[in-house]
Amino acid sequence: MTIQTDGKTDVLWFLPTHGDGRYLGASEGARDVSLPYLRQIAQAADDLGYYGVLLPTGRSCEDSWVVASALAPLTQRLRFLVAVRPGLQEPSMAARMAATLDRISDGRLLINVVTGGDPVELKGDGVFLDHDERYVVTDEFLHIWRGLMAGETVNFEGKHLRSENGRVIFRPVQAPYPPLYFGGSSPAGIEVAAEHCEVYLTWGEPPAGVAEKIAKAREAAERKGKTFSYGIRLHVIVRETESEAWEAADRLISRLDDATIAQAQATLKRQDSVGQSRMMALHGGDRNKLVVSPNLWAGVGLVRGGAGTALVGSADQVADRMKEYIDLGIDRFILSGYPHLEEAYRFAELVFPKLPLRATTGTAPSTARNNGPFGEVIANDIVPTRRVSAH
């Protein structure tokens, strides 16, 4: 399954299930990420024409599958990028969850493959494997998961995972399965992405760093006879003028003190994620070294793991920087801004008219049926056969 690029781009927004507010690292201006608030963001993104929304995963977040299942019936066209977690989930259970959510959303599910990069959190979740061994699990997981979602009866025996006569009876709407997104900067991660996935993701490094990662990912994919689509994860601070945007960036970290930054950086350093290390190297924890490329600001990464950079500037400047990434091969952006409700509107109103956007279209109605109807499954395993009437 290969997604072809056409010189245009999709823009996804972000559901802040781990918290939202006006300032980083402070309770002042914070918001309760209740279901009604998340519904407002999702419905705004749907109405504004965002392609989809990313739901984060991990112990700092509400469960992404439950949230997406709650919001899918409340939206019409919006796609939901939700994580499978090799090592935390069994592939058969993850496949059933994905197939069901794809069906009840009428084909609006996207899959984010997350191996995990924090050994402390992973041990709390029962995963005690080192960095490269976790990617072995991810590879085995995806072999099984993809086969199940494609309708195969899966028999697999790997180093960590086994499946004997595994099946998914209720198939997803999207064939053979929803697109797989994958972000991994290490050689092990890139190889797994090239083997299994359609979209290779990177966090928002300067263009030279993104070009380097794309080149490595493209080479790995070509060795396997595949072609990637490429996405980038960034924050955005856009205003009508550049000076207003930089003032907003300064306000966002205005409640941060040095002790909070030091504590956050020490916690992030325990991760063995190559991508996280690359993010932290951009600023070194120094709030005086945050402009890492034209209109690219690393202030978010002082206290936030994962995506730590933001495009900052006027609408024209932000659009121009995005077009520079598009020229490198990026064809989908996953964006966010604080607070997420207001900034979803602001970005769409100011920047959408300046971007080569693909049209956001819904899927055909009434596609989510049980590949039937055929009645109830017999003995939890056998699909009743359709009898042909004699005439």
Curated annotation (Swiss-Prot):
GO terms for biological process: alkanesulfonate catabolic process. NCBIfam families: alk_sulf_monoox, PRK00719.1. Its EC number is 1.14.14.5. This is Alkanesulfonate monooxygenase. Gene3D superfamilies: Luciferase-like domain (3.20.20.30). It is an enzyme of class 1 (oxidoreductase). It catalyses: an alkanesulfonate + FMNH2 + O2 = an aldehyde + FMN + sulfite + H2O + 2 H(+). Pfam families: Bac_luciferase (PF00296). Catalyzes the desulfonation of aliphatic sulfonates. Keywords: Flavoprotein, FMN, Monooxygenase, Oxidoreductase. One of its GO terms (molecular function) is alkanesulfonate monooxygenase activity. Belongs to the SsuD family.
